[in-house]
Design a protein with these regions (language model features):
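Short secondary-structure capping/turn micro-motifs that flank functional sites
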Residues: 40-41, 123
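Surface-exposed, charged secondary-structure patches
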Residues: 8-12, 41-98
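Short beta-strand segments enriched in hydrophobic/aromatic residues
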Residues: 36, 91-93, 118-119
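Short, low-complexity N-terminal intrinsically disordered segments enriched in polar/charged residues
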Residues: 1-30, 34-38
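Short beta-strand edge/turn micro-motifs at domain boundaries
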Residues: 98-124
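Residue-level detector of alpha-helical recognition elements and their boundaries
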Residues: 28, 35, 46-48, 102, ...
Length: 124
């Protein structure tokens, strides 16, 4: 029984992550906002500079870069425990760059929300 529950939760988390990816493809942050909690944060390096703060940084970056119609994504790991989860995703060709994202998620009112996104921008 726990395997079935786990699979269902993993599928729900994958759907949340897909909302994020779809927003990257469209280049419209309004399309991805439903994946994130309103108080979510983002952290990672852009070149030598640390970007860290509210998720609005991601929304601004996404809107500024526009559609990433060639974006490819692959979830490599989801780990769930009751109402908390972590996930790792590989993203190729987001504005010509490759990213590795790590998410922490929390199940709130029956829905999985990304609370934190930590990213690695691969060297060109």
């Amino acid at each position: 029984m726990s395997c079935v529950v786990q699979t269902t939760e993993e599928e729900a988390i994958a759907k949340t992550i897909q909302v994020y990816v779809d927003g990257g493809i469209s280049g419209r942050s309004d399309d991805m906002k439903h994946a994130f909690h309103k108080d979510a944060t983002i952290s990672g390096y852009v070149g030598p500079d640390l970007l860290s703060g509210p998720i609005q940084h991601l929304y601004d970056w996404n809107n500024g870069n526009g559609p990433a119609t060639s974006l490819q994504s692959r979830i490599t790991n989801i780990d769930v425990y009751e109402t908390i989860a972590t996930a790792r995703i590989e993203l190729d060709n987001w504005t010509g760059r490759k990213f590795t994202d790590m998410f922490t998620l929390l199940k709130i009112d029956g829905q999985w929300k990304i609370m934190s996104k930590v990213f690695y921008m691969h060297a060109e």
